[in-house]
Amino acid sequence: MAKTIVIKQIGSPIRRPAKQRATLIGLGLNKMHKTRELEDTPSVRGMINSIPHMVEIVEEKG
C-alpha cells in the first residue's frame, strides 16, 4: 500500500497570486478547513511546500 498524507486548507485564496490558487485547486482543496487524503509523492510534497502558509499536514499514513 502506498503512503498517504492528509492535508487541510487553513488559508484563504482571496488576494493570493493566481499560481497559489491554482496549486490549491491542483491539490483538490477549494474551501477553508477541507481535508484531502493524497498519495505521498514528491510532486504532492512540492505543491504543499510551495504554499505552506495555506495548508497544513494533519497526518501521515503508511
From Swiss-Prot:
Annotated protein name in UniProt: Large ribosomal subunit protein uL30
Keywords: Ribonucleoprotein, Ribosomal protein
Record has Ribonucleoprotein as a keyword: yes
Gene Ontology biological process: translation
InterPro entries in the cross-refs: Ribo_uL30_ferredoxin-like_sf, Ribosomal_uL30_bac-type, Ribosomal_uL30_ferredoxin-like
GO MF terms, alphabetically ordered: structural constituent of ribosome
HAMAP family tied to this protein: Ribosomal_uL30_B
Family recorded in the similarity comment: Belongs to the universal ribosomal protein uL30 family.
Signal sequence residues: none
Regions annotated as coiled coil: none
Alphabetical list of NCBIfam families matching this protein: rpmD_bact
Listed GO CC annotations: cytosolic large ribosomal subunit
Oligomeric and partner information: Part of the 50S ribosomal subunit.
